[in-house]
Amino acid sequence: MNVVIVIPARLSSNRLKEKMLADLEGAPLIVRTWQQAMKSRLANRVVVATDSERIFAVLRDAGAEVVMTSPDLTCGTDRIAEAAEQVGGDVFVNLQGDEPLIDPATIDLAIAPFFEDGPMPDCTTLVFPLKPDERHIIDDPHVVKAVLDAKGNALYFSRCPIPYRRETLPDTRYYRHIGLYAFRADVLKAFVALPPSMLERTESLEQLRLLENGYRIRCIETTTDTPGVNTEEELEEVRRLFRERFGS
C-alpha cells in the first residue's frame, strides 16, 4: 500500500506573516515539519504542496519533494487533493505545515488503521483527551472538540463544549481534535467534489462535510500534544521547545 504524507504550505497566512518561512534554529519552519514527517515508519513518501515559488525553492534546496498547486484553492484539503492527482497513492495524510514538533509516531497512529484486517477506514484523525475541569479549553471556540461513538468513530465535531455538561459525571469524556487526517484516496477525491455542507459552514469545520455525507471518521486517541504556530508568541514557544528537544 502506498501511503503519502502531503504537507500543504501556503505563503500567505492570516495571523503570522509568511510563517512557513519563519526561521526555526537555522531552517525554515516548513523544512522542520518536512524533516519530522520523513521519520514516519508507515509512509512511503512525503510531498509538500505549495502555491509559492519561494517555498518551492527553499524545500527543493533542502532535498524535499515539492509540487506546485493552484493559488486559488480555499482550504488545505483541496491542496492535498490536487497534489494527490499529481503524485498518486492509496492513502493520503494531511499534515499541517506549521507543526515542526510533530512526533513521527503520532503521524503513524493515524496511518496504522489502514493496515488492519478488514475494510479500510474512510478517514482517520487524532483526538487528545481533556479533563472535565479544563473548562478554559473546553469552552474555547478556537479549540475544536470531538464526541465519539463506542467504536471510536466521530459522532460530531464542534467549537462548542460537547458533550454539554448538565451534570458532573465521572465517566464523561472530552476530546480536543488534532487536525491531522489520513484519507483513503477515493474518499479524498469524493470529499473535495462535494459542496460545503450546512454544518460545515455553520461551524467553519470542513470535516463535518464528511459526516453529513455519511462517511465515517475514525478517531485515534493520542496523549502527545503538538503545538502549532499561528502567532509570534507561539513561534517563540516552539523555538524554545525545539531547542529543548533537538538542541540549538
Curated annotation (Swiss-Prot):
Pathway: Nucleotide-sugar biosynthesis; CMP-3-deoxy-D-manno-octulosonate biosynthesis; CMP-3-deoxy-D-manno-octulosonate from 3-deoxy-D-manno-octulosonate and CTP: step 1/1; Bacterial outer membrane biogenesis; lipopolysaccharide biosynthesis. It is found in: Cytoplasm. The keyword Nucleotidyltransferase applies. Keywords: Cytoplasm, Lipopolysaccharide biosynthesis, Nucleotidyltransferase, Transferase. It holds the Pfam family CTP_transf_3. SUPFAM superfamilies: Nucleotide-diphospho-sugar transferases. Activates KDO (a required 8-carbon sugar) for incorporation into bacterial lipopolysaccharide in Gram-negative bacteria. Belongs to the KdsB family. This is 3-deoxy-manno-octulosonate cytidylyltransferase. The gene is kdsB.
